[in-house]
Amino acid sequence: MKTMLDTIRPAEDATPEQPQNQAQNQVQHQAQNQAQNQAQHQAQNQAAHADRDQRTVFDLDLIKRYDQSGPRYTSYPTAVEFDPAFDAERYAQVCRESNASGRPLSLYFHIPFCDTVCFYCACNKIATKDRSMAQPYLDRVYKELEMQSALFDSDRIVEQLHWGGGTPTFISQAQMRELMDQTRKYFKLADDDHGEFSIEIDPREARGDTVKLLREIGFNRMSLGVQDFDNRVQQAVNRIQTEAETMEVLEAARDEGFRSISIDLIYGLPYQTVDGFMTTLERIIEVNPDRLSIFNYAHLPSRFKPQRRIADEDLPPPEVKLDILQATTERLTNAGWLYIGMDHFARPDDELALAQRDGTLYRNFQGYSTHAECDLIGIGVTSIGKVANTYGQNRRELDSYYEDIDNGRLPVFRGIELNRDDELRRDVITRLICHFRLDFADVERHWDINFADYFATSLPKLDGMVEDGLLEVDSAGIRVLPKGRLLIRNICMAFDAYLEAKKGPIGFSKVI
């Protein structure tokens, strides 16, 4: 029976003989030119058919069959593999060595505080009504900024910046301004036209004047947490948020010139129905944000204490969750939205959709991005950074984070230094997640490998997916088909060496 390996491996007798004279050299040169022209034509043809290539089809039978647990691949290897052997000392050494590359920088700030706890939340957060907790935390963040900045050359530009949480808008307007001022004190930020500066906003914590301030201090993108407008659902998850609050922030963002507005929804929450969720979705479509994130609620009460407040019997059954996802996917695609991947949709003219068509889209801990070559510095409790071929994570408990900072120590407590195999597999997984296609020759040139030989144990795992119409594999590469786009995590798992080594439950959320 013919397998993927048979499809992409050339026959042994197909190796061309070496040219013996000038005429043969000329023939070879002409062949190379012809191949280059064909490649250029193929690239132009791909661009011309971009809309067709970005279609997404929801196949319920396939979704059910492939609905398993798996990583989200915001990193590879995933954080499960991080090790305390990679400590602050090694992290600092890697950062200094990275200056030779001259790569631009990306900054992620974690602001962990929330006024109230949302019962569905799996983020690292501190629920408190005490706003006075913010300043001692920010004072430590400023000290960390100083320590981190000392590791990087001052001419390395910050092209990407993100405030996440928690709830970044928990801090006061004066503290927001101060945090951005301190950031500019220690790092050089790109100008507004080139920088991607984003913030996560809880509309209950922001009003028009807050949005005006955020634009003034440099933010040009935002994501709004909505989840669902249905009042019964909101009460069940302890997040009461009116539609008017959301619309006020969205309209203010447009008035102030924010270049990208994203809205987050969650399906699978208590009491959700197809009709109820579609009512929320229709209202969101009417206001036409630039991007939408449709997240699957992963109910893991044994790991996340707030989720214990959600009764299992109040959750929609699996078939209803799938019905919600199907209705949402079909409604958005029929309305002209493109499925970027990993729960994200965008309008065809959005920069993420354009970057995906151009082959320049990237994915990291901050989600999809158009800034691929940045070294990412994580600032604040539990933040994760990516510098050169390493990942490093800060302390996850506030007290230990404070202790490190107060003693003049970088708070990095674990991480991983990628070997060549890790880097190669990360490249393959990133290409698939971002572009839904893989060019074998390009990977072979970049990594000096024979793809079929190197991935001899991975490629056979795709056989069943090919038969099911999720993807196509030939001697040129892999192309994910419309039915396979929603199952891209399953496809990437075939190239994950760490999953091969695991036995028993792997502890990740469901892919759908």
Label each region the model flagged.
Residues F455-A456:
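Amphipathic alpha-helical substructures
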Residues M1-L105, S154:
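Flexible, acidic/Gly-rich N-terminal and inter-domain linker regions that tether
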Residues T3-P10, E97, P104, A127-L151, ...:
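C-terminal scaffold of the Radical SAM
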Residues F109-K125:
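Local cysteine-cluster metal-coordination motifs and their immediate loop/turn environment
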Residues V466-A476:
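A short, conserved structural fragment
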Residues V233, R357, I478-F495:
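Short, cationic-aromatic polyanion-contact patches
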Residues R485-I512:
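Short, amphipathic alpha-helical interaction segments positioned at domain boundaries
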Residues V443, P460-D468:
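Basic amphipathic alpha-helical segments that dock to polyanions
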